[in-house]
Swiss-Prot record:
Belongs to the SELO family. Its EC number is 2.7.7.-, 2.7.7.108. The keyword Ribonucleoprotein does not apply. Mg(2+) binds at N251, D260. One of its GO terms (molecular function) is AMPylase activity. NCBIfam families: PRK00029.1. Keywords: ATP-binding, Magnesium, Manganese, Metal-binding, Nucleotide-binding, Nucleotidyltransferase, Transferase. It comes from Rhodopseudomonas palustris (strain TIE-1). The active site is at D250 (proton acceptor). The keyword Transmembrane does not apply. This is Protein nucleotidyltransferase YdiU. It catalyses: L-seryl-[protein] + ATP = 3-O-(5'-adenylyl)-L-seryl-[protein] + diphosphate; L-threonyl-[protein] + ATP = 3-O-(5'-adenylyl)-L-threonyl-[protein] + diphosphate; L-tyrosyl-[protein] + ATP = O-(5'-adenylyl)-L-tyrosyl-[protein] + diphosphate; L-histidyl-[protein] + UTP = N(tele)-(5'-uridylyl)-L-histidyl-[protein] + diphosphate.
């Protein structure tokens, strides 16, 4: 029985300059590592069939579903601030789109499926380590409630890829609301192809912002919609200590999802200047720089849309600048509301912003673990007089000691009882995030020993990040000095 993919493909209806038609390159011996069964069901797929040898053939690219229309998408992008007019999918091939059980159109893409016309000098393949990292982190982000691409499957290819060091090859099946990027708009704008910019904008409106079609200025509504989603998204990243690592415009999703998990990482000790990515030598994409970089990326999108916003360029620029001016308000509102909730503040008072920021200052001065400090504060919410377990996380607790009485006084003014407040705080302060040293241990077990038991266990832990279980206590702990991962790699 054939594994059926109910593809309904819309992107291939766009002009041929939007993509290159290309088939995946077959692999030697596909072996399914992991299938995301709940996601498969949500997509209208049969997980039992996908777990058969034939399923592995499809998920590796060796066989193509009948209704697939495989393409590599064209896009450009600013990489660390430098514009590259042609990038495109160099190792990812979009099989097609399905409409899931919620009526949402989703892309199904094979990452590591072989060379495409956009591969440049690359081999089009993916190594096992980065595939496992993306699977773990994208699924963890989904469980944390943060918009993200998803991972449907991971497959070993039976081949090796030439990386440093040589690694087993793998293919990730990625699911996204779409793979339209800011860089997709830049690809056509850089060529002066206004007709294609308009066609792409119309497609993005129909797919992601249908309400914009009814607005007095649909393209302005599109821009404002993307600005709003990116503001909310980055605010959510900041709440869990997530550092994307490569916030290039080609990694900025118009749908408002986290996309392209390369050298991403979750911060341990709180420091706004934290950088893990080996290729971010000057800290452009450091944790604390992510909000202004998001605005920078959105400004590049606005530049592409100027000619659609008004016939006169000066007027179009003025309209775009006004829209971009709304980013700070949207981001700050989301950021401060989320941060207040993490501190157990569910009503608003004038000094709340200062109280929230002073806790972050105390974390930085005390070199405290970001995730664990908020979680232990949640645990202490029932009896705020005893903050010993929180205080113990600070190498220098002086700033925390100064802050704690003000927090106690502030939460005493909240209408909720202590138990309700604690439950609410635990719903926004995870016990578990994908800590870098844990991911590294999973990758080492898989790559060095073909042992995927740690991979399965970390997925189980991270599927319920807000629910503490005694047997998973080690996953909540920061790394010991010898376990610290100071640098992460793109893996491409």
């Amino acid at each position: 029985m054939t594994a059926h993919f109910p593809f309904d493909n819309s992107y291939v209806a766009l002009p041929p300059n939007f993509f290159a038609r290309v088939a995946p390159t077959p692999v030697a011996a596909p072996r399914l590592i992991k299938l995301n069964r709940p996601l498969a069901v949500q997509l209208g797929l049969d997980p039992d069939l996908l777990e058969t040898p034939e399923g592995a053939e499809i998920l590796s690219g060796n066989q193509m579903p009948e209704t697939a229309a495989s393409i590599a998408m064209a896009y450009a992008g600013h990489q660390f601030g430098n514009f590259v007019p042609q990038l495109g999918d160099g190792r990812a091939i979009l099989l097609g789109e399905v409409v899931d059980r919620n009526g949402v159109r989703r892309d199904i893409q094979l990452k590591g499926a072989g060379r495409t016309p956009f591969s440049r000098m690359g081999d089009g393949r993916a190594a096992l380590g980065p595939v496992l990292r993306e699977y773990i982190v994208s699924e963890a982000m989904a469980a944390l409630g943060i918009p993200t691409t998803r991972s449907l499957a991971a497959v070993l290819t039976g081949e090796t890829v030439l990386r440093d060091p040589i690694q087993p090859g793998a293919v990730l099946t990625r699911v996204a609301s779409s793979h339209i990027r800011v860089g997709t708009f830049q690809y056509f704008a850089a060529r002066g192809d206004l007709a294609s910019v308009r066609a792409l904008a119309d497609h993005a409106i129909a797919r992601h912002y249908p309400e914009a079609a009814q607005a007095p200025s649909p393209y302005l509504a599109l821009l404002e919609g993307v600005i709003g989603r990116q503001a909310e998204l980055v605010a959510s990243w900041m709440m869990v200590g997530f550092i994307h690592g490569v916030m290039n415009t080609d990694n900025c999703s118009v749908a408002g999802e986290t996309i392209d998990y390369g050298p991403c990482a979750f911060m341990d000790t709180f420091d706004p200047k934290t950088v893990y990515s080996s290729i971010d030598q000057f800290g452009r994409y450091a944790y604390g720089n992510q909000p202004p970089i998001a605005l920078w990326n959105l400004t590049r999108l606005a530049e592409c849309l100027v000619r659609l916003l008004a016939d006169d360029d000066d007027k179009g620029i003025e309209i775009a600048q006004t829209a971009l001016g709304g980013f700070a308000e949207r981001f700050n509102a989301a950021y401060l509301a989320k941060l207040a909730a993490k501190l157990g503040l569910f009503t608003s008072q004038p000094d709340d912003q200062q109280l929230s920021q002073e806790f972050l200052t105390a974390l930085a001065k005390g070199e405290a673990d970001f995730t664990l400090a908020f979680r232990r504060l949640s645990d202490a919410a029932v009896d705020p007089s005893d903050l010993g377990e929180v205080r113990a996380l600070f190498a220098d607790p002086a700033a925390f000691d100064e802050w704690a009485p003000r927090w106690r006084a502030r939460i005493a003014a909240e209408p909720q009882d202590a138990t309700t407040r604690q439950a609410a705080m635990r719903r926004v302060n995870p016990a578990y995030t994908p800590r870098n040293h844990r991911i590294e241990a999973v990758i080492r077990a898989a790559v060095d020993r073909d042992d995927f038991a740690p991979f399965e266990e970390i997925l189980t832990v991270l599927a319920n990040p807000f629910e503490e279980k005694a047997e998973f206590a080690r996953y909540a702990e920061p790394p010991q000095p010898h376990e610290e991962v100071l640098e992460t790699f793109c893996g491409t």
